[in-house]
Amino acid sequence: MARIAGVDLPRNKRIEIALTYIYGIGLSRSKEILKKTNIDADIRCQNLNDQQIVSIREILESSYQIEGDLKRFESMSIKRLMEISTYRGRRHRLGLPLRGQRTRTNARTRRGGKKTVAGKKKAPRK
């Protein structure tokens, strides 16, 4: 089993797809990496030799931010937005949608489950 960037790649999948298991690598970036290393995209992960694995690893380390580095960069960006109190930072802090979506309805993913508020009660008759 090939282990690249701390991720065990699935043995029986094509290398083009297996690379997408690494955080920060999608299908287009996977194809780009394979083109740089001159590895056929149809090779199964279990059929890679050590030299091919090393070449993929070298390109990933030199050219791309992946896994922990990328996650750290994203969290630092969000913290920076919150510290300088931008609109997006305040929305992150409140746990609300950031990009202009409506919140009166349909914001359940960011806001969590429904919290029922009691309705207005009628005054008792005399």
Swiss-Prot record:
GO molecular function per UniProt: rRNA binding; structural constituent of ribosome
Any Pfam family hit: Ribosomal_S13
GO biological process: translation
UniProt KW RNA-binding keyword: yes
Bias (Basic residues) ranges: 101-126
Positions of disulphide bridges: none
Task of the protein: Located at the top of the head of the 30S subunit, it contacts several helices of the 16S rRNA.
Family according to the record: Belongs to the universal ribosomal protein uS13 family.
Name of the protein this chain belongs to: Small ribosomal subunit protein uS13c
Organism (species): Porphyra purpurea
